[in-house]
């Protein structure tokens, strides 16, 4: 620490040699050490800046051309060179050129040496895996196919003895069934994903290969495009594409949702509406070629559709115009916005539920219908909230062929509300809404749906039935027998009025003019009587449960035989009792009494406490003091101890029991004879708790019945 130099102020990565140099610098007054100090400083500077250059490698010195040149020419110039010094040095440092190390960085050449142990202890990825093993097996099988495997195997068996043992194990087929593990794995059924066959595009079929390649090269350089929003390929988009074609033969189009999810459909739409050819497709971009003067789209062959599409088209025929900007798979749904808003003479279809059936759907039926509706194609596309009578009439026609109508909501349509759409359609059609969100609406025709033909037949049948009823009524009135009733010498002519309009009018005249107050009184009386009957029924159920619980409690109590108290009770003086009470209150160890009460385990714990101390403290959580006293007496009787006192604590009541002066621990067999086990004690506690709850609820029912009877009596008194 001389001359104001603090070693701790330097970086912490100083080595022991550097610290030694610092100490030498502090003693620089000694002239004998100056030369040694200069040598160490030069070595320190070179090693500090370039630690990799201090290695004494023969190969490194051989490859350092500049250093060799400098060493060869050192005899030419032996002048000292001033080099940078450390901060603690007082004077300059002068060294000869041959004493300076070359500080130029050089790339360390890689040593090309073959390591024979690389394949043994170095880890290689993909060498010991399942795929690698399969490749090895395939290569071995190929080798076997090329060579004569049978002769080779026979020669090997003759030369080596252990191969015969392996063959015997393979023939046994006990463990592996005669096949190696990788052979069994290959026999498993694996359903591979089939690659989609690449279908040539329209541009590849029409344009020449050279022209198509040139157009694709130019298309890859384009940086300007036309955006297609959610509304699809509208007229504005088509006009922008055609305006770009005036300046260039190519136009780039970028699709937004939902068309970007189905670029094949987007390509069909763009070619159909613009009349061009798509020459390049990449992600959500399409490049459209305007085509030459000889190109015409009329001569193209129609794409053969699948049976699924043909059936769906046949289902939608006659319902309305199709929506050609459809962004999903075929068939094209009906554009509901082009259907009329108001249909003259439209009425909600009549409905009639079949006998012994409910029109309301159950949860299982609703789930089943949703699963059915998921793979179905969309039938309609809707973009407005009101004026849906045309769509409703089309849905009713569709329901004659299909029980479910699936409606998609247009992307990009303004002010659409799927809730209002669903409510309007449900009101107009009378169907059942099984699914609704911001993308689609699914309607079920219902169990009570009747097609137009069936509804007409039902109406004709009802009309015929009413005609027959009218005929029977007129015939019965004409054939009524006249009854002669003679009263006080007078002859009266009366007819049989049963089932006629006169009978109804008489009943209406007799009972129809009752006071509304009397009707309210009768209704209230009927309600009270019904409630009284219900409460009495519930009370009878509670009483039956109480009887059952009493029987269970009686059986459990019969298993417990309380021991008889000992007549020879040990007498304690007041001083001894007070002393034992204080000892018991100061004790930290205690025995907690749970919901099971006094059983075999409690007595074992009590005697275990008495094994080490004279007083045992038992804590119980019972709220009623009478139950606490009963528990204390039971503990005193069963343990043959002396009850000291019962103290009120913060956590409950503490029962202090003294074991006695002549204490002797009884055997566990004697204690288990008359006490309940842990399981039986828990069952007894549960039954007692249930019994108390049932009695409480029965008391509430009895009070409610009494109140109802009083209300019924008061109502009858007020009526008179």
UniProtKB/Swiss-Prot annotation:
Required for the splicing of group IIA introns in chloroplasts, by regulating the intron folding. Forms splicing particles with RNA. May also be involved in chloroplast protein translation. InterPro entries: CRS1/CFM2/CFM3, RNA-binding_CRM, YhbY-like_sf. SUPFAM superfamilies: YhbY-like. One of its GO terms (cellular component) is ribonucleoprotein complex. Residues 131-159, 447-477, 517-553 form a coiled coil. Residues 205-301, 359-456, 570-670 form the CRM domain. Keywords: Chloroplast, Coiled coil, mRNA processing, mRNA splicing, Plastid, Repeat, Ribonucleoprotein, RNA-binding, Transit peptide, Translation regulation. GO terms for biological process: Group II intron splicing; mRNA processing; regulation of translation. It comes from Arabidopsis thaliana (Mouse-ear cress). It holds the Pfam family CRS1_YhbY. Homodimer. Interacts with RNA. Part of large ribonucleo-protein complexes that include group IIA introns and CRS1. Residues 1-77 form a transit peptide. This is Chloroplastic group IIA intron splicing facilitator CRS1, chloroplastic. It is found in: Plastid, Chloroplast stroma. Disulfide bonds: none annotated. GO terms for molecular function: mRNA binding. Disruption phenotype: Plants are albinos.
């Amino acid at each position: 620490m001389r001359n104001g130099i603090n070693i701790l102020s330097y970086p912490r990565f100083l080595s022991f040699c550097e610290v030694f140099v610092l100490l030498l610098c502090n003693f620089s007054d000694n002239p004998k050490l100056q030369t040694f100090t200069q040598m160490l400083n030069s070595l320190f500077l070179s090693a500090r800046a370039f630690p990799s250059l201090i290695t004494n490698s023969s190969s490194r010195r051989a490859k350092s051309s500049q250093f060799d040149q400098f060493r060869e020419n050192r005899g030419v110039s032996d002048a000292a060179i001033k080099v940078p010094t450390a901060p603690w040095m007082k004077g300059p440092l002068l060294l000869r050129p041959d004493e300076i190390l070359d500080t130029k960085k050089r790339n360390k050449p890689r040593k090309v040496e073959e390591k024979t142990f690389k394949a043994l202890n170095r880890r290689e990825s993909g060498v010991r895996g399942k795929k690698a093993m399969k490749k090895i097996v395939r290569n071995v099988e190929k080798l076997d196919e090329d060579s004569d495997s049978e002769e080779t195997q026979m020669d090997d068996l003759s030369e080596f003895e252990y191969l015969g043992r392996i063959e015997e194990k393979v023939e046994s087929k006990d463990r592996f069934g005669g096949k190696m593990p990788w052979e069994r794995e290959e026999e498993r059924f694996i359903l591979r994903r089939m690659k989609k066959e690449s279908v040539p595009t329209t541009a590849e079929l029409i344009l020449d290969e050279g022209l198509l390649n040139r157009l694709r090269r130019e298309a890859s350089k384009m940086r300007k495009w036309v955006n297609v929003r959610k509304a699809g390929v509208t007229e504005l988009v088509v006009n922008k594409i055609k305006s770009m074609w005036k300046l260039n033969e190519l136009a780039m189009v970028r699709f937004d949702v939902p068309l970007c999810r189905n670029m094949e459909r987007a390509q069909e739409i763009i070619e159909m509406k613009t009349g061009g050819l798509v020459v390049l497709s990449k992600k959500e971009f399409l490049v459209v070629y305007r085509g030459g003067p000889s190109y015409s789209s009329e001569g193209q062959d129609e794409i053969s559709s699948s049976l699924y599409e043909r059936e769906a088209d046949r289902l939608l025929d006659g319902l309305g115009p199709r929506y050609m900007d459809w962004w999903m798979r075929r068939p094209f749904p009906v554009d509901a916005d082009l259907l009329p808003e108001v249909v003259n003479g439209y009425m909600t279809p009549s409905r009639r539920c079949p006998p012994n059936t409910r029109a309301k759907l159950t949860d299982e039926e609703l789930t089943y219908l949703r699963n059915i509706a998921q793979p179905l194609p969309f039938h309609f596309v809707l973009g407005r909230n009101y004026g849906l009578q045309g769509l409703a009439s089309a849905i009713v026609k569709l329901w004659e062929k299909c029980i479910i109508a699936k409606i998609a909501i247009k992307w990009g349509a303004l002010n659409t509300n799927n809730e209002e759409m669903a409510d309007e359609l449900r009101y107009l059609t009378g169907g059942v809404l099984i699914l609704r969100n911001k993308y689609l609406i699914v309607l079920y025709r219902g169990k009570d749906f009747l097609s137009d033909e069936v509804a007409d037949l039902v109406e004709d049948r009802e009309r015929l039935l009413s005609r027959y009823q009218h005929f029977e009524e007129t015939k019965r009135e004409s054939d009524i027998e006249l009854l002669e009733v003679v009263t006080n010498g007078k002859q009266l002519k009366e007819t049989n009025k049963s089932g006629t309009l006169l009978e109804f009018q008489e009943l209406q005249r007799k009972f129809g003019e009752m006071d509304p107050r009397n009707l309210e009184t009768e209704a209230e009386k009927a309600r009270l009587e019904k409630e009284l009957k219900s409460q009495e029924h519930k009370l009878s159920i509670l009483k039956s449960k109480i009887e059952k619980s009493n029987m269970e409690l009686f059986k459990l109590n019969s298993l417990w035989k309380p021991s008889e108290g000992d007549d020879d009770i040990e007498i304690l003086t007041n001083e001894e009792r007070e002393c034992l009470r204080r000892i018991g209150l100061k004790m930290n160890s205690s025995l907690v009494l749970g919901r099971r009460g006094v059983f075999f385990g409690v007595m074992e714990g009590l005697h275990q406490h008495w094994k080490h101390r004279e007083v045992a403290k038992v804590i119980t959580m019972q709220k009623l003091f009478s139950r606490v006293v009963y528990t204390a007496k039971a503990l005193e009787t069963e343990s043959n101890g002396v009850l000291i006192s019962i103290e009120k604590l913060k956590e409950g009541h503490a029962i202090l029991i003294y074991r006695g002066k002549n204490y002797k621990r009884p055997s566990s067999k004697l204690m288990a004879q008359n006490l309940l086990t842990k399981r039986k004690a828990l069952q007894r506690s549960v039954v007692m708790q249930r019994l108390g709850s049932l009695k409480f609820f029965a008391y509430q029912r009895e009070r409610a019945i009494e109140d109802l009877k009083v209300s019924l009596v008061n109502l009858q008194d007020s009526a008179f």
